[in-house]
From Swiss-Prot:
GO terms for biological process: nucleotide metabolic process. The lineage of its organism: Bacteria, Bacillati, Actinomycetota, Actinomycetes, Mycobacteriales. This is Nucleoside triphosphate pyrophosphatase. Its EC number is 3.6.1.9. Signal peptide: none annotated. The active site is at D79. Keywords: Cytoplasm, Hydrolase, Nucleotide metabolism. One of its GO terms (molecular function) is nucleoside triphosphate diphosphatase activity. Disulfide bonds: none annotated. Nucleoside triphosphate pyrophosphatase. May have a dual role in cell division arrest and in preventing the incorporation of modified nucleotides into cellular nucleic acids. One of its GO terms (cellular component) is cytoplasm. Belongs to the Maf family. Coiled coil: none annotated.
Amino acid sequence: MTRFVLGSASQGRLGVLRQAGIDPEVVVSDVDEDALLASLDPELPPEAVVAKLANAKALSVAAALPQELLADCVVLGCDSMLYLDGRLSGKPGTPEAARRQWEQMAGTTGHLLTGHALLRLRDGVITHTEGDTGSTAVHFGRPSEAELTRYVDSGEPIHVAGAFTLDGLGGWFIDGIDGDPSNVIGVSLPLVQRLISRTGLSISEFWTR
């Protein structure tokens, strides 16, 4: 049986997959995202940046898999960033940065980009390497000063791409989206289905119900 490995510590991604019938093995990559970003050509399109990060994560996870998974599995690596006003933003990391991010994006529209990299492994050998980037337009509302302070104080926006969530407290301040909602949470279900099919497998093979 082919196993599904999620190369991410994101509870959002894990939750999306579980709600969609997949209970993956979770193996977290050890990629230094900041160092990798600093090494990339600054002229790279934003879609290519998140794709390269996702691919690096998938390869890192594949190199660390135990033997029982190496025999037959797929590894999914993902990376999400917000593209707004010509600039990519990842996780803000601090309350101050999260507040600045919201002050910039309130009342505007950005694009949440999620790079996906899928590796198929058989007997420890990578037989397929597939990848694509999902893009969803996000229309941000305008939280009041008190609401923004409370949101930042909750800690939620500090460790998520773009300083917002669609499926948590941040959802109160999202006026709408154009595109795939699961991509905003961190893993695009229809995109993963297409990547899986390119390896000769069907997504339904991984369903647990």
